[in-house]
């Protein structure tokens, strides 16, 4: 019989072939496992990367939005206010204006107050465009100034009345005035007339019947004591007191000089022609009556808060008329 027998050598070869086959299978499984693991890791990494990218983008967008909002807020905070420049005598006009500075700032305006100690420069500065408004004078003075100087200024609001008073210099009682006593009065036309009317009301002089608010020393028709009328610039009247017997002084300059209307020898009556005529006004150049600046200024000044301030601060020396 020619059947091939299984020798030891043959058995060994079979076993060796079997082991090689198993190694190949195991290696294939290992490769597949590694490939699957790599795929899973790659997928997770991709998802994490995408999530990280999204989070980064969201953070960046939020930061940019916040920075944009902060920038807008900063720009709003630092936005320049539009200036309203107003000329005024110190007392009470500049002091009254100071009360509305914060209110105007809330409305977008920076109130700049320029103080003057005379009655000419505030009007020339307003006419020349150096000011947006002024606040120091009454209507008769404004009308007279326009007529004499060819200016174009108009009143936009009446604010308060300041009673004119006779104040003691060398003499403290009117009945003690002697022959030839000196009396200081303002040297501008309208305020001089007002002073003369006050002297007339006290029986010290008599004026022409039609003199009225245009009265000057030339309109004096009776002067029993032969009083010496000294015409002095209004801002200097308080300083003149040591050199004269009495002086007729505007309410604002009296207050500025430390005088109290309660201490005056005589004061304009509340029902006098002066009280009806001499309210102090806010003035602007013609053509600016309805400007946004003018309206904002007038609304701020003609308020209950300002009225209360005037009454509490000045008493009978300054009387609101609005």
Describe the predicted segments one by one.
Residues 22-47:
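Sec-dependent N-terminal signal peptides of Gram-positive bacterial secreted proteins and lipoproteins
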Residues 41-67, 71:
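Bacterial lipoprotein signal-peptidase II cleavage site
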Residues 80-91, 109-115, 182-183:
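Short, well-ordered beta-strand elements
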Residues 113-124, 212-239:
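Short helix-initiation/N-cap motifs at beta->coil->alpha
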Residues 144-156, 170-171, 243, 248, ...:
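Ligand-binding "clamshell"
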Residues 156-205, 307:
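A conserved helix-loop-strand patch within extracytoplasmic ligand-binding domains
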Residues 163-174, 278-291:
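A bilobed periplasmic-binding-protein/Venus flytrap-type ligand-binding module shared by bacterial periplasmic
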Residues 191-200, 301-321:
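Periplasmic-binding protein-like
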């Amino acid at each position: 019989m020619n059947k091939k027998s299984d020798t030891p050598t043959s058995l060994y070869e079979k076993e060796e072939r079997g082991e090689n086959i198993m190694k190949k299978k195991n290696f294939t499984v290992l490769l597949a496992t590694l490939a699957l693991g790599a795929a899973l890791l790659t997928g997770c990494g991709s998802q994490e990367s995408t999530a990280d990218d999204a989070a980064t983008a969201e953070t960046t967008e939020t930061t940019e939005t916040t920075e944009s909002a902060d920038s807008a807020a900063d720009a709003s905070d630092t936005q320049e206010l539009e200036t309203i420049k107003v000329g005024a005598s110190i007392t009470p006009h500049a002091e009254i204006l100071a009360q509305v500075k914060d209110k105007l700032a809330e409305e977008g305006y920076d109130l700049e107050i320029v103080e003057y100690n005379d009655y000419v420069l505030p009007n020339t500065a307003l006419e020349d465009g150096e000011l947006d408004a002024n606040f120091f004078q009454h209507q008769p003075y404004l009308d007279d100034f326009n007529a004499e100087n060819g200016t174009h200024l108009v009143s936009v609001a009446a604010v308060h009345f300041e009673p004119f008073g006779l104040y003691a210099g060398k003499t403290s009682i009117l009945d003690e005035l002697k022959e030839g006593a000196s009396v200081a009065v303002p040297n501008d036309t309208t305020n001089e007339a007002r002073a003369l009317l006050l002297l007339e009301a006290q029986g010290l002089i008599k004026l022409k019947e039609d003199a009225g608010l245009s009265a000057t020393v030339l309109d004096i028709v009776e002067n029993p004591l032969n009083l010496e009328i000294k015409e002095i610039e209004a801002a200097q009247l308080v300083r003149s007191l040591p050199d004269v017997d009495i002086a007729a002084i505007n309410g604002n300059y009296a207050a500025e000089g430390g005088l109290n209307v309660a201490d005056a020898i005589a004061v304009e009556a509340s029902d006098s022609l002066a009280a009806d005529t001499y309210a102090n006004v806010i003035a602007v150049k013609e053509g600016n009556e309805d400007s946004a600046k003018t309206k904002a200024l007038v609304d701020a000044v003609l308020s209950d808060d300002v009225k209360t301030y005037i009454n509490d601060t000045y008493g009978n020396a300054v009387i609101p008329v609005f």
